[in-house]
């Protein structure tokens, strides 16, 4: 059973037509991009190209293109935000909860690209070449979260959990980093984890 099938009836005050939700989400994405530009983020990779996929983590082009290994973490963000809003805001429509999720993700993207967090990543994690996201990458990250949110709405709960675990394990074994390790190393870096992350791909 999916969470969508288990939702309670939505009050009229909390309901929001899809077209209006889409308009709000697009406006939030525009605000996110504008704020990032004001913060000094570059619109696209300084290499002058925009790639659909860039798979080299230890590279100055990481987090500069449309998708990369960390895109999977943002899809998981969508899973988590759907579950969280489903638990806390059950009487809200899924469209209203999507707006909440987009606000949270956009807020994180702005925080992640602040000087404090960038330096935190560089000092405490393996991301020595990280100098912040390009605007196109940051917006694509939010779109990845939205895709995860929508997947969680339609997939059975067991399938959503299985996909999240699969992403974490496979990405972790390949680049020695994932959402879980990223959060741990951001909050409290461990030398043992940092040393492990310096190794080659396991798969």
UniProtKB/Swiss-Prot annotation:
Q: Where are the transmembrane segments?
A: 20-40, 69-89, 155-175
Q: What is this protein called?
A: UPF0314 protein Rpal_0309
The subcellular location is: Cell membrane
Recall the taxonomic lineage recorded for the source organism.
Bacteria, Pseudomonadati, Pseudomonadota, Alphaproteobacteria, Hyphomicrobiales
Q: How does it sit in the membrane?
A: Multi-pass membrane protein
Q: Which InterPro entries match?
A: DUF2585
Keyword terms: Cell membrane, Membrane, Transmembrane, Transmembrane helix
Highest taxon listed in the record's lineage: Bacteria
Cellular component per GO? plasma membrane
Q: Which family does it belong to?
A: Belongs to the UPF0314 family.
- UniProt cross-references to HAMAP family, sorted A to Z: UPF0314
């Amino acid at each position: 059973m999916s969470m969508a099938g288990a939702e309670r009836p939505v009050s009229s005050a909390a309901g929001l037509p899809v077209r209006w939700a889409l308009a709000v989400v697009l406006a939030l994405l525009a605000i996110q991009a504008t704020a990032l530009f004001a913060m000094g983020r570059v619109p696209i990779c300084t290499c002058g190209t925009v790639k659909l996929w860039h798979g080299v983590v230890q590279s100055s082009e990481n987090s500069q293109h449309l998708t990369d290994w960390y895109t999977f973490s943002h899809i998981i963000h969508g899973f988590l935000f759907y579950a969280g809003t489903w638990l806390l805001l059950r009487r809200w429509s899924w469209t209203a909860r999507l707006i909440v999720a987009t606000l949270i993700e956009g807020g994180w993207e702005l925080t992640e690209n602040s000087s404090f967090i960038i330096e935190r990543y560089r000092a405490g994690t393996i991301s020595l070449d990280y100098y912040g996201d390009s605007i196109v990458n940051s917006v694509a990250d939010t779109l990845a979260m939205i895709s995860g949110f929508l997947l969680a709405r339609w997939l059975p709960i067991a399938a959503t959990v299985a996909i999240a675990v699969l992403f974490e394990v496979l990405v972790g074994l390949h680049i020695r980093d994932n959402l879980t390790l990223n959060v741990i190393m951001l909050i409290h870096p461990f030398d043992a984890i940092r040393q492990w992350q310096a190794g080659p791909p396991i798969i």
